[in-house]
Structures are given as C-alpha cells and as structure tokens.
Swiss-Prot record:
The record marks K121, R124 as: Important residue of the cationic membrane-docking site (MDoS). Residues 121-133 are annotated as: Important for membrane-damaging activities in eukaryotes and bacteria. Coiled coil: none annotated. Expressed by the venom gland. It is found in: Secreted. Belongs to the phospholipase A2 family. Group II subfamily. K49 sub-subfamily. Transmembrane segments: none annotated. The record marks K128, K133 as: Cationic membrane-docking site (MDoS). GO terms for molecular function: calcium ion binding; calcium-dependent phospholipase A2 activity; phospholipid binding; toxin activity. This is Basic phospholipase A2 homolog Tpu-K49a. Its main location: secreted. InterPro entries: PLipase_A2, PLipase_A2_Asp_AS, PLipase_A2_dom, PLipase_A2_dom_sf, PLipase_A2_His_AS. It comes from Craspedocephalus puniceus (Flat-nosed pitviper). It comes from the Eukaryota.
Amino acid sequence: MRTLWIMAVLLVGVEGSVIQLGKMILQETGKNPVKYYGAYGCNCGPLGRRKPLDATDRCCYMHKCCYKKLTDSNPIKDRYSYSWENKAIVCKEKNPRLKEMCECDKAVAICFRENMRTYNKKERINTKIFCKKTPEPC
C-alpha cells in the first residue's frame, strides 16, 4: 500500500503532498489515483502544462496552475492538515501557505469527481506525443 502512495507522485507531476493528494482523490472518486489519473491526458503526470484534451485533463492543468501560484513551498515534503467530514474534504491547516496547497489538492480531487462521466479510458496512459505544447494561460 505504501508503494501505491509513493507512486502517486506521477499524478500531477511532482506536485502536491503525495499521500494526502492520493487519499483525497480516492475519497472523492473511489478510484485508484495512480491507475486512473497518473498518466491521463496531456497534463496529468510529470510533464509541463499542455493544451488540455478534455475536462479530466483540464483538472490536472488547473492543478498545475494552482501550484504555480504557491510560493515558498515544497509540495513533496510539506504536509497539511485536512479531514474527510460528511463526504467532504475540509482543509483545516492554520498555516496559510499549507492551506493554499490543501485547497489546490482539494480542487483537483473534486474536479476529477465532477468529471467522471466524461473520463476517457483511451487517455488513461497517454504518451503525450501528440499533446500541443502551447497551453492556455492560467
């Protein structure tokens, strides 16, 4: 199980508190975060921002934009406080910088849930070869 969460780093590059982000996605979607989102589309994974292919890919794109706005953080090492209450993610972090990080991760997890109907299994493992390099502005 520990390996699964460590591998979750592939989700949106090396962004987000890996364990917490993976748990949020699992809680919101019920899906394995690595299998379903680790290499999805043109934006889920370690590459930079690209033009999103669909709504799910746009979730990853927006998450990268959200993280781009954060300053003075180490998204791999930094951990924040959150809980799962009444089927909702609640960011409880007092530190403003860590709270922002939590809100970025919460937003992508909710975005994945809200776009499950349009999830395209063909994009689950996208090699990114045909992704357009010019992204939309954040």
